[in-house]
Amino acid sequence: MIGIICEKPSARRNFAKALGGDTGVYNGEKYVIVNLRGHLYKYDEPHKQVNKELENKYKQWTLDNLPWSYTDFKWKRVKVSDVVPLINSIKKELENCSEIVIATDYDAVSGEGFLLALELLEETGLINKKNLIISRMIFLDETPSTIQKAFKERTVLEDIYKNAECRKSLFRSRWDYTSQQFTRAAKAFTPAKLGTPRQGRLKSYIVSEVGQALDKYNNHIDKKFWQNRFIDDNENIYVSSKETKYDTKEEVPTDKYKQSTVTKESEQMKQSPPPRMYDMAKLTGVLASSGYSVAQIKNTYQKMYENSVLSYPRTSDSTITLEQFNELLPLVDKIAELVNVDKDLLSYRKPRATHIKDGGSHGANRPGVNVPKSIEQIESVYGKLGVRIYTVLAKSFLSILAPNYEYLQQKGFVTDYPDFKTTINIPKKAGWKAVLGNLNTDDEEETGKELGKIAEPIIFEGEYPKPKYPTILWLTKQMEKYNVGTGATRASTIGEMSNSKDKSSLLENNKGRLSLTYLGQYSYNLTKGTNIANVKLTEKVINTMGSIGTKDEINPLSVIKEIDNLLLEDIETMKKNREEMQIAYSERPQPEKHSVTDKKGNTVEFKKEWNGYKFTDEDIEALSNGETIIIGPFQGKKGQYFAKGKLDWQTYKKRKFYGFSLVEFLNSKD
């Protein structure tokens, strides 16, 4: 009997559909399918990992007990809550199997999916069963044909602990566990009333990135400048890098330049291919500006994936394989019609070298093989968010089937003053841009007019550019630039850090615009200049995982042991930062309030948050106008819900106050 371990119940259902049931015979082999439910085990608390004489050291959160010693740990695991019946059921199904197939998700970078199964096999003792064969199924989606093929082509693992996936997963999990020391160090410098600043490598880097961007944005002073430039008869501007920028218009010399002809230096037709396909981070960044939370996007996508409407969500790829391309090619016209894209625009129906590459795994986020019949069908099952997700990913995929964007690039200069130059791009053929429309987030600067004939000197009034305000889309691009996490990891980490229900959250998310919470600001100030907040540390962890199993392998244990010196350096840096911090963090601030006039004409104040939800500017305006609004989502035991309400006088413990008054709870915002 072959036992197949799936990652989650939905995967088990899809495997059963592909193979003919939860148990049965496929390809002449008897099988039984079981499913995990994410992690069933986790590493025990540090003080329970060591010998008795060391328990007190690892239990106390003091600087004197840092750094830890890696060799002290026994790496014991404990069951997570409410999984004992599931574990017992799985063990019962698998204990008589002669082969166990690890059919969890394939996470090429971290080996996370492999770890889920490894934990079960080790902790139940199944891994020690005599003559047991352990094999691996790798599948790129959960369609029947893919699962059937993966079952037939599964690979036997001769030594599970020499497997690269296994070794990556153990390295990452143990590095992250050991890095808890950075949180303990930060806690030692943090007032108890503030809570615990969680200083994991990703969270620390994100806080640092957002904090630095906010500093630049908030400290920027709007300032104008005046400069000599030229303008031609087609309104193209010519600039010299040698020209001084003056603080006032009166300072600009007006007798230096005269009218001149324009010389065309070069003219060339150019083209650009479609942008990279989407991952979860980019998708989240685009949709967050419409007010959707990271959790909403993640959960809706997962449901669509489980029904093969979309591809695997947690991919690390930005390209697709030739096989994946050919799988969707026959469905192109149906997908185009569904999202209202003119099929005549899709004239490049062959693999692009920039987007179709060998060596990927799940492939970039894209439509699945199950194409819905209509937009209305998508909305009825997955809501308006489902429509947005499908439309974005469908147009992203369809854009690679459109011709390149073509434009004429002209370079010119002012004949008598050749230091004054300009470059203009004139659109000629829209190509893929006609498919993407306003979804193109990396647009080139375009000009509608060619070079003119005559140029006149002008005093140009300009403004020094303001730094970008940090948004989810901006942050995910920064993380992508440094190869920090997969798209799904970026999205989920940002979502976790900006969860308004969590009092230890470090970020605030207002329709995709990010800011630091009070604790987040403290964390940012405390960890300036530390190793844990430096992107290079995360890069090293990722590069180490990537090297495992290759000829250029970096010793994983040596990377974990480096934490000791990094931590000692960070403790000194935090100590210095804490001494220099000017803001008193001993008290958590009270929620902000907003003034409004009630029905009787009295000026009253109401809190700008309710039940952990922070009202947006639009919410406050609507409430101030007496409107009823819907806020959320909130997370309950039975899932997400929303709250409908308005401003009104209320009484709590015999005290009257003015604030958001609940009308009713709703299952959706629509």
Positions of predicted regions on the chain:
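Basic, low-complexity terminal or inter-domain segments flanking catalytic cores
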Residues: 2, 22, 123, 199, ...
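Metal- or metallocofactor-binding catalytic centers and their adjacent structured scaffolds
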Residues: 160, 164, 247-276
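Phosphate-interacting basic helix/loop segments used at nucleotide- and nucleic-acid interfaces
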Residues: 73-94, 100, 207-209, 286, ...
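Structured, non-catalytic alpha/beta "coupling" segments that mediate domain-domain communication
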Residues: 19, 23-53, 204-247, 398-443, ...
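C-terminal or mid-to-C-terminal helical accessory/interaction module adjacent to the motor/catalytic core
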Residues: 88, 142-232, 267-271
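Intrinsically disordered, low-complexity regulatory segments
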Residues: 1-181, 463-466, 477
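Structured, charged N-terminal subsegments at the starts of enzyme catalytic cores
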Residues: 273, 278, 282-291, 299
